[in-house]
């Protein structure tokens, strides 16, 4: 396949990238206006980040919640979906992040008819484009985990950091339009974490305490995220005493990405690219140390006693085994305040079948499917239900919800369940 260096004019600026024959055809409109618009967008992104060419991707993951899309975003999707000329369907498997509601529980949450209408319109447009509405931020646990060196175009930050670090796949943080563009063209600009040199460690972190619970794993991730402090930083981490479970790594990575915009970390001796420190870095890396007092300090900064309005387990969505652990804590108990457990549409049926859902809901809890709390009109939910003080075991969630008007409180899963029963944190 031939390749040529293409000049593309954008707002009087000349963009120069090498395109192969297929990409040249897309750009000239041979595949229709939808693919052409997608590639034009990708050329601008590639130019901004200094990409020389494109890399084929095998799958894409699109941020699709309507709180982020808004009316303008949904209209844009509808315009793409209504195009009859040329090819408008995705070229590689493309799935979605959590949507903005659980339709079965929308009235309980306080979602309005206007919110639900916007959600249905977005879903319709995505489906017409060939996107699979998986509605999950844990696709690496439920759909199709990427493999080592597989180039993908993923959007959710927790998905990206897990896929890059634990699976050794290659993705940048792709914004919604960019991830959809990758699905429509089957490629993404080759920059950032698609490049081997960009994946080498830039700092070394020694951990003096291996976390014992999911909220501690999140706290450690948040601390390292703060230390790293930017998207291009890649921590190489030593001191973890035993291989973490998938759910522990999920909370660890999600918090690191939330606190520091980190997209890749290496656990020396544990993650695929870092059998030894010298595989990903060198002895002269800037060094940092995290001790138990650091973890306790972050936990305490989000902890307080007193009344609780609602308990939420979300961000990331819960795995089947997290729901099992939660269900075991609910047996024979009754909640005084609402408890929400958010999972994926792939996990929810198994939770139903295995009796976890009924145990949680018999205690007064609610199991939600296909959404994520902070992406589902969290501010409006708070106003509709009078919720202010929110307890959770998710460090990512406490980092986000302060901006939505909540007073988030970090606690363990056990402490959160106790708070739901008594209505307060001791």
Predicted regions and their residues:
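Non-transmembrane, aqueous-exposed alpha-helical and coiled segments at domain scale
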Residues: 11-426
């Amino acid at each position: 396949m031939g390749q040529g260096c293409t000049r593309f004019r954008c707002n009087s600026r000349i963009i120069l990238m090498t395109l192969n024959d297929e990409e040249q055809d897309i750009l000239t409109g041979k595949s229709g206006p939808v693919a052409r618009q997608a590639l034009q967008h990708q050329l601008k992104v590639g130019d901004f980040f200094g990409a020389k060419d494109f890399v084929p991707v095998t799958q894409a993951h699109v941020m699709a919640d309507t709180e982020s899309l808004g009316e303008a975003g949904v209209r844009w999707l509808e315009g793409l979906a209504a195009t009859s000329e040329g090819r408008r369907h995705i070229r590689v498997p493309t799935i979605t992040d959590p949507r903005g509601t659980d339709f079965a529980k929308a009235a309980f949450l306080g979602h309005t008819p206007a919110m639900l209408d916007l959600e249905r319109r977005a879903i319709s447009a995505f489906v017409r484009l060939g996107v699979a509405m998986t509605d999950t931020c844990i696709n690496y646990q439920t759909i199709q985990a990427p493999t080592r060196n597989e180039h993908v175009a993923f959007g959710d930050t927790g998905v990206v950091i897990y896929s890059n670090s634990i699976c050794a796949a290659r993705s940048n943080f792709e914004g919604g339009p960019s991830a959809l563009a990758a699905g429509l063209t089957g490629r993404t600009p080759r920059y950032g974490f698609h490049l081997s040199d960009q994946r080498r460690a830039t700092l070394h972190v020694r951990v003096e305490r291996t976390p014992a619970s999911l909220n501690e794993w999140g706290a450690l991730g948040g601390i390292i995220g703060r230390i790293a402090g930017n998207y291009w930083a890649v921590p190489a981490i030593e001191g973890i005493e035993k291989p973490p479970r998938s759910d522990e790594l999920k909370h660890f990575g999600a918090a690191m990405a939330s606190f520091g915009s980190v997209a890749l970390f290496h656990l020396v001796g544990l993650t695929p690219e870092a059998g030894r420190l010298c595989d990903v870095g060198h002895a002269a890396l800037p060094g940092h140390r995290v001790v138990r007092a650091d973890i306790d300090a972050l936990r305490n900064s989000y902890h307080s006693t007193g009344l609780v309005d609602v308990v939420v387990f979300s961000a990331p969505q819960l795995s089947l085994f997290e729901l099992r652990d939660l269900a075991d804590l609910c047996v024979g108990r009754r909640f005084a305040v609402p408890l929400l457990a958010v999972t994926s549409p792939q996990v929810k049926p198994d939770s139903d079948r295995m009796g976890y859902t009924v145990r949680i809901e018999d205690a007064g809890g609610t199991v939600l499917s296909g959404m994520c709390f902070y992406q589902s009109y969290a501010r409006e939910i708070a106003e509709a239900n009078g919720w202010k003080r929110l307890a959770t075991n998710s460090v990512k969630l406490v980092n986000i919800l302060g901006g939505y008007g909540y007073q988030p409180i970090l606690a363990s899963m056990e402490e959160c369940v106790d708070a739901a029963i008594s209505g307060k944190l001791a």
